Amino acid sequence: MKKVILLLLSACSIFACTHTPKWELVWEDNFDGAEPDTSVWSRIPRGKPDWQNTQSFDDRCYEMRNGLLILKGIVNDNTEADAAQYLTGGLWTKDKRAFHGGRIEVRARLHGAKGAWPAIWTLPYETDKYSWPMGGEVDIMERLNHDSIVYQTVHSHYTYTLGIENNPKHGNTIPINPEDFNVYGVDFWPDSLVFHVNGKRNFVYPRIETEQEGQFPFNIPQ
């Protein structure tokens, strides 16, 4: 999997422009070193949630080669030491790097496998202050198994705890060619999240007027 991660900020006032700004690149990582930049990235530790219960520090799950960051899922050959049937590699920026507003894009190729669940997503930087799902979750990309579609979704107290998933619609799918590198992105605006793949807009999640709490908690550093 090759990931080129970009953060771009609008050159105009996000309150004044009409969401067609000129973007200014403020940060990128092309993973062209021998190892991921440890001032930005850490390996994700094992955890209880489904997405985290096979995460491993095993070096076999990580590779940097020819400008590629390769995150792998492998069969665990030592279940006496670790009961997980599979081991997977993952990186996050937790406690190291955060951004507020702008566009995030990730270029990646996803190899399919039964049970595979690769994902690219954001959570609030201050996780101790904003417990899930109160601070929201932005799924820039999720893919299942050998699918030729990806999911782009938001989660929050409004969508998850209150179960309001269609007012407004909280996610959408879009076809991809799994054999290609694809660019997955989201634009953070004060009044909406705009999701896109390969520059094509997929869907918009707007902030709406509602008496229910937690509908749009995304105007915080991610």
Residue ranges and their predicted role:
Residues 18-222:
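GH16 jelly-roll
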Residues 1-21:
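Bacterial Sec-dependent N-terminal signal peptides
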